[in-house]
Every structure is written in C-alpha cells, then in structure tokens.
C-alpha cells in the first residue's frame, strides 16, 4: 500500500524490527509521473478533483499509458464527493434541476462516459507492525492525500529468495524449522532456566511490475518532497534478492466503503 500511495516504502526503527539499509526504497516510478492537484482537495469550495483526475489521465495517455483505475483512500474519496465542483459537474451531467446524491457509483458512471473511461477504487487497509523494541500496533499504510493511477489492478508481486538459516546444519540440530510458502518458522529452547522462542522470517520484498505505467497524485496541492526518490532505487529488488525469485499475487481489492 505504501508502494501505491508513495511509489516507495519507508523503513525505520519505528516501523520495522529488522535490518534497515535504506529509509526510503523507491519502486522505480519516474519523477515525471509524480503529480499534484491544482488545489488542496480538503477545500470543498475551490478544489476540482474530477478535473485533476482527468488531467492526470490525459497526461498519462500522452506517455502511451491508458489509465483504467484510480485508487484512493476512502477518506480522500470523501473529500472528492464533498467538493462543489463535483456536485456541479454531476448535476449538469445528469441534467437535473433538483438535488442529487453524490455517491461512488454516480461518480464512476460519469467517469465511465469520458473519452478515457476510468473507475475509482477505494481502499482502507490496516496492518500490524512491530518496531525494534517489539512493540506492536495497527497502522494504515496508505499515505493520505495520495491518489494512484493504474492500467491494471495486478500491480506487482512479492519476490522472495532463499533464507540463510535454511541450510545451516548447526541450526537444524538445535531447532525445529518449517517453511510455509516463503516464510521460515524456527522454534528453539534453552533448558536452565527453561526458555522457548519462535521466530518467523522471510527474504522478500514487494515489487511493482510496471512502474513506468503508474502515476501518483498528491491531492494537497503541494510539491513532492525531494526525499521521496521514487525512481532512484529501482535496482534494489535485484540486488537484494539475488537471481532466484518467485512471484506472489498482489491484486487490489475494492472496499465497500466510500459510497
């Protein structure tokens, strides 16, 4: 989810209990695909989210990319449907003189009738993380006020390789090891005083299959931070994993929220 909302993911001791070699790992999305809205979407009076979406779709088309899906957090969709420009555009489109109820279905019907039809997908993910002090908490990995433009919902894969502990003869003598898919679970103990540990580990990283065809728009109207080098670390997966990798499906699922 961070890859889709930031074109990279952020690692630090605060959100990752493992080894941190780089704080921001980009997915390879070109800097020219970094977009921003004309105005902050939270300003319902001046923002024009539908026009921002159309402008990005047209810009992508000029690069040979046909956008089909517009993915955003449910809270950002709520900002879009509250904008005066959205209400005015839809009211004129349905040719209604009375009040209309702005919903995701209605907005998607409007977008489907445009020269380059697209569909809005809303997400509201939640994941558990553990920091270096082994404190666990639930976070939403999607960066707020970011909208992702995609050709296909099959965004990428989790690529994974072998784990060093698997081939350790010494470890195999003192621990029980079980491999489930690409996650290695190791269990071992000490006698005096008796202690027992269980550890799960993986040599894996999420990878966007076609970062050139992904566009991300900041909808706060502000420029991208220079530290978000979305294209500068495109070689990380190959150098990190080695030669042998296996794909894992990461297809996006639409939520029922945002109506």
Where are these regions (language model features)?
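Intrinsically disordered, low-complexity, compositionally biased regions/tails
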Residues: 12, 21-22, 30-32, 53, ...
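Extended, solvent-exposed, turn-rich assembly/linker loops in the middle of proteins
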Residues: 20-106, 110
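Sequence/fold signature of self-assembling virion shell proteins
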Residues: 35-44, 87-259
